[in-house]
Amino acid sequence: LRNPVNTELLHRLRDLRIPQCHLTAGCLFQAIWNHRSGNPVDWGVNDYDVFYFDDSDLTEEAEDRVIQLVSEATADLGAKVEVRNQARVHLWYERRFNAPYPQLRHARDGIDRYLVACTRVGVDVASGELYAPDGLEDLAAGVLRINPLYPDTRQFEAKARSYQDRWPWLRIR
C-alpha cells in the first residue's frame, strides 16, 4: 500500500459500504514491482480497479449508480477508478470478448480469473484483509506463472510479455 492513492481509496470506499468491495489488480501488484525496480510506486498504473458483488439488482443502471457514487467520492484524487460489479460480468463478457464467462458468486471470483497467478491479489475494503490465493512469494520474486484456474496460454503469454516489457527482471515460467 505504498501508493498513497491505494490508501486513500481504501478509506473512501470503506465509507461507501459497497458490498464485497475489493481494491485489486495493477494498483497493488505494480506497486511491489515498482518498488523493487526503483520506480515511483504509481509508475505504469493506468487505473485503480474496484470489484464488488451485488446480485440484488443486475441492471446496468444499478452498476452505473455505484460507478457514479465512487466517481463522486474519488474525483479529487486525479486517478482513473474502474468499478465493476462481478455479479454482472457473465451478462456482457461473451458479447464483448467472444468467450464464455461463468456466473460468479463472490467478488473474489473475479480476482481468481486473472491470467497471471501472482497478480491475483486484492484488499477487502471492509476488513482490510489481503486476498492472495497464490501467496506473495512469486509476486515479490517477479515470477509470472499461468493461473491454473484459467489456463489460456495465448492470453497469458501476451499479458506476461506486456508486464516483462515494463519490468524486464520479471521471469515467465
Which residues are covered by each model-predicted region?
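Catalytic cores of the polymerase beta-like nucleotidyltransferase superfamily
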Residues: 1-173
